[in-house]
């Protein structure tokens, strides 16, 4: 079961991050809110508190429609998700760089 959830993380997360970046680039607060909310649920399923909190910040930014901090928080979220991805790759026994 856990392995399936890990596979789902690797399958869905790149698309969610791309949707977040597109929403930020287009100034689409509603799309940012939805994508950040989805990613928050994904990362929190692994107990990734920092990534979850950062996704929540983006969700709130999207809801407010004041996207002035969105790019900065989006970059922070990408770093947090990369850390989680690294940890999950190690868990799966995959070689990591």
Residue ranges and their predicted role:
Residues 1-38, 42-45, 64, 68-96:
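Long, amphipathic alpha-helical coiled-coil segments characteristic
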Residues 54-63:
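Hydrophobic, amphipathic alpha-helical faces that serve as interaction scaffolds
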């Amino acid at each position: 079961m856990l392995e399936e959830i890990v596979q789902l993380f690797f399958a869905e997360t790149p698309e969610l991050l791309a949707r977040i970046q597109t929403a930020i680039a287009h100034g689409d607060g509603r799309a940012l809110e939805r994508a950040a909310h989805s990613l928050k649920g994904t990362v929190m399923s692994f107990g990734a508190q920092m990534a979850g909190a950062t996704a929540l910040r983006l969700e709130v930014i999207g809801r407010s429609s004041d996207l002035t901090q969105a790019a900065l928080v989006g970059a922070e979220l990408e770093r947090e998700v990369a850390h989680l991805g690294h940890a999950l790759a190690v868990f799966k026994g995959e070689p990591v760089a």
